[in-house]
Amino acid sequence: MVNPKIKTLKNLKALVQNLQQNGQTIVLANGCFDWLHVGHIRYLKAARALGDYLVVAVNGDASVKKLKGISRPLMPVNERTEILAALTCIDYVVVFNELNVEQVLLSLQPQIHCKGTDYTEQTVPEREIVKSYGGRVAIVGDPKDHSTRNLLQRSMKIDKNTSSDSNK
């Protein structure tokens, strides 16, 4: 089933330009979103609150593997995008296969580019790109207390404890 929220960059560019011409504020958030957790939800809701439309750019499988390691992603990109598209705070989802979101930013030129609290406005890698077209960077979400890596470690610990309990 085709989800109308999931767009190609080309289709999304035309849509975003039309929305901006009509005075709408576009916010872009990005990430791997491999095993969605409450930290992601808080980040996305806070990003959505800054504008009229929230676009989420999702790393493709190859870029997740390069960024996070050979055992990742846990879920393929088609599943990650479907889950994200189901969230009411998200208006559109687009996949990018590069290691960073610069090409998406240059193409869409959202007024606001959001990053999580593991960044500061000075450490956002794409900040110069965003400034170059007149956009701004916003740091949103709760403190970086949640991560997929921590969830994986806890899950593995629970699994080991469960296995040893069943051997008694």
Regions found by a protein language model. Name each.
Residues 1-168:
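Nucleotidyltransferase catalytic core that binds NTPs
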